[in-house]
Swiss-Prot record:
Domain of life: Viruses
PTM section of the record: Sumoylated with SUMO1 and SUMO2. Sumoylation of viral proteins seems to have a positive role on viral replication.
Region (5-fold hub): 1-80
Family classification: Belongs to the rotavirus VP2 family.
Domain notes: The N-terminus binds RNA. It is necessary for encapsidation of VP1 and VP3. The N-termini of 10 VP2 molecules form a cylindrical hub underneath each 5-fold axis of the inner capsid.
Keyword entries, A-Z: Capsid protein, Inner capsid protein, Repeat, RNA-binding, T=2 icosahedral capsid protein, Ubl conjugation, Virion
Protein name (database record): Inner capsid protein VP2
Site features described as Interaction with the intermediate capsid protein VP6, chain residue numbers: 220, 224, 228, 839, 841
Cellular localization per UniProt: Virion
Spans annotated as Hydrophobic: 394-414, 422-442
Record's function text: Inner capsid protein that self-assembles to form an icosahedral capsid with a T=2 symmetry, which consists of 120 copies of VP2, with channels at each of its five-fold vertices. This capsid constitutes the innermost concentric layer of the viral mature particle. It encapsidates the polymerase VP1, the capping enzyme VP3 and the genomic dsRNA, thereby defining the core.
Coiled-coil blocks: none
A GO term for molecular function: RNA binding
Amino acid sequence: MAYRKRGARREANVNNNDRMQEKDDEKQDQNSKMQLSDKVLSKKEEVITDNQEEVKIADEVKKSTKEESKQLLEVLKTKEEHQKEIQYEILQKTIPTFEPKESILKKLEDIKPEQAKKQTKLFRIFEPRQLPIYRANGEKELRNRWYWKLKKDTLPDGDYDVREYFLNLYDQVLTEMPDYLLLKDMAVENKNSRDAGKVVDSETASICDAIFQDEETEGAVRRFIAEMRQRVQADRNVVNYPSILHPIDYAFNEYFLQHQLVEPLNNDIIFNYIPERIRNDVNYILNMDRNLPSTARYIRPNLLQDRLNLHDNFESLWDTITTSNYILARSVVPDLKELVSTEAQIQKMSQDLQLEALTIQSETQFLTGINSQAANDCFKTLIAAMLSQRTMSLDFVTTNYMSLISGMWLLTVVPNDMFIRESLVACQLAIVNTIVYPAFGMQRMHYRNGDPQTPFQIAEQQIQNFQVANWLHFVNNNQFRQVVIDGVLNQVLNDNIRNGHVINQLMEALMQLSRQQFPTMPVDYKRSIQRGILLLSNRLGQLVDLTRLLAYNYETLMACITMNMQHVQTLTTEKLQLTSVTSLCMLIGNATVIPSPQTLFHYYNVNVNFHSNYNERINDAVAIITAANRLNLYQKKMKSIVEDFLKRLHIFDVARVPDDQMYRLRDRLRLLPVEVRRLDIFNLILMNMDQIERASDKIAQGVIIAYRDMQLERDEMYGYVNIARNLDGFQQINLEELMRTGDYAQITNMLLNNQPVALVGALPFITDSSVISLIAKLDATVFAQIVKLRKVDTLKPILYKINSDSNDFYLVANYDWVPTSTTKVYKQVPQQFDFRNSMHMLTSNLTFTVYSDLLAFVSADTVEPINAVAFDNMRIMNEL
């Protein structure tokens, strides 16, 4: 094993004081090792400035001799004078530079698998309710009767389509639909049981209590409740629990139990869950030191590839997705360590440039902006942008030749597609007109805006020098290779970049350029270019290592991406300063950094959770669109369905998404098939709409309208009301058909002939129990409204309750007044609660444990970074 002597590459001219300061700094750094490791592992990144190294200066000065302390103080004084221009870093200190937009990062990391929520109750639409019974004279009896009523009767008053209620109900079912049910977890004690038996959930227990305490309950039913308990079949790992459910609720819960998404979990599944490239990477040592029980279960994540093709014509949405991926990626790219001391490197560069008082201005620019913060920032930006396929734009100054020469390295190792076209053309044109063409004495390139060829493509055809033309050819053809790995489309770098060989090609071209005569340029110009090339060529070994390090980190993190990496130019770009590229090239040390296993697993889990949630929300949206279509609500609800879909993905600012993309998204969603479970659930609702309408206090099955007033009748459930329980003797017209055709002539003719008409179809009604308001409304007949407006949807039939509970009841009794109404609500009787028909036995596994984080069972470690190898089985960084 090769060992490296710390500080071996520092220059010979660094004096003893600097060495002593370095040793003291290393001691200090070791003392704060735990603090640094905490900062590295923390999710919140921060910029570490140089002020921390001065905290214990006083203690260090006391330990040294008087003479050494004087020299040390002089060094510190000199450093303070240059602090504005130069940042000096301690060796082995990490320099995080990126402060993520924590809101987006938190939204991404907070997306958890839905199965994590524990089911404590069965799914129910109905609940049994006691209602009073009224005598013929309107007085309430002491007896009660049990009926099935809706738990959430959420239909609002007024002009509201009942079909919207069913769409909202379906949406509620989809939201509450469990991925698995374990009845043992929700079972509660039956208080009335003789032998401490259990029933399936707390609502069943409360219903049993209420029935048991009801004076009218038969003795046989009470005895049955006392016998209610679970039945265990241990040999089959099965348990049966008694439950009290409406038949429709029983159908729902039985379906959920039969179609659970849990699957058996074993070590092989966990092993295969880890991305294959990480399993096969010799730098990572993975162990599973636990045998799972036979009852272990997991829910397979839904990782279908993007069925909406968001990269195609969804510029705003795609920009948001790539931005969030970029922020996530930057948080997991490792920080560079042991960068070359900025001060020492600038001193060495100054020596190489032979800077003197009379040096031309251009060469002093070479040193501006070089610091380790920029180098680390550049490293993270390049890898994160490639992982998220974010387009980058380049910022540079044409007169800073060092930036342009560094840009030549950048264009060599990063595919052209990663840069916005305008920025790429500007950078290439600057390199051609500043370095390449002057070297050969060629005239400046006059580039026409909009030319399909880039400046490098034009230059490749015109330059005769083989090495330079060969390098230009490589850059012009440097594209990602699209490779499908484990069913995911990956954007892979060229092999010459991965192994670093391309840097030799770049250096050959640079050396050829530096040997040219620059015939049309002054000597100073030629010297500046040559010295800039010399600075970069002196670091050939480090640049090869840097390129290999960049490629390795990119490909290792790419293994954790689960969605196809589609390459499309993004609306916004990530800015990259070429001076930061210079910093990276000049300051890269010889310390290898690779992602920690914990970071990789975290990155993989966040990607899986977002991808799975994305697919589940697509399935929900497709199901709701299909339901809206079948309920004839397609036009009315479409935009809100798409908006809800985007909101549930967490990362989108829905208000800012352009309408054209909303409608394009709607069209794509319409073309997708409905998932089987969601379709079956909708069919269950559709088949039982009549029962659900009956159980609602706000939905009627029709309305009877007449020209003359109709007398109120006694109803057993409400007293005196304008409710009709059957339509015998009335002419019937279908409400849906009437609204579709808009032909009201038939109604008008019947009413003019004094024949009441029954309009049949689900519609809402407003409850009003005041007799005074009834008298006030008698003048405005519904008939007048229909003839005038010809709109049935303005019809609001009113349910009037006049009984012994009403404040106005005695008014009726005293004045012998017979209340009447021009409308009657047709309302079918809700289903009566029958204990025997509502008793169901539900069956599930006796026990199983669902694990949501499969990677928690894997213990992982890495080899010593210095020994980490790349794909070619050679050390990532060889320049020791």
